[in-house]
């Protein structure tokens, strides 16, 4: 019985450690985003990430790459968080809607 309890405690501690490690890796790092945080050759990969969950992949990629080339910034995540990249957030269409996905 003691071996069972010890094994359970060790597994619980190991599981907790793994969860904490994974959550630290997934944290938002502001120094990785923001105006000028990217080089122009990095836009393709960042836009692929940004547009990964949309059903309108081609237009998303087109406008994301256009915005990234101008702003050198792509917000974190696949949606929202545009406040991190002011240029990306403030570029509007003629109708006043957002130009950047």
Curated annotation (Swiss-Prot):
GO terms for biological process: gibberellic acid mediated signaling pathway; response to fructose; response to glucose; response to sucrose. Its main location: secreted. Keywords: Disulfide bond, Gibberellin signaling pathway, Secreted, Signal. GO terms for cellular component: extracellular region. Pfam families: GASA (PF02704). Gibberellin-regulated protein that may function in hormonal controlled steps of development such as seed germination, flowering and seed maturation. Belongs to the GASA family. This is Gibberellin-regulated protein 6. It comes from Arabidopsis thaliana (Mouse-ear cress). The gene is GASA6.
């Amino acid at each position: 019985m003691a071996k069972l309890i010890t094994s359970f405690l060790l597994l619980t501690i190991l599981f907790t450690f793994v969860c904490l490690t994974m959550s630290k890796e997934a944290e938002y790092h502001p120094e990785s985003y923001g105006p000028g945080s990217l080089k122009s050759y990095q836009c393709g990969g960042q836009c692929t990430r940004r547009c990964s969950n949309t059903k309108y992949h081609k237009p998303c990629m087109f406008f994301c790459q256009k915005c990234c080339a101008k702003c050198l910034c792509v917000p974190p995540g696949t949606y929202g968080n545009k406040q991190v990249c002011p240029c990306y957030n403030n570029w509007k269409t003629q109708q006043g809607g957002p130009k950047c996905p």
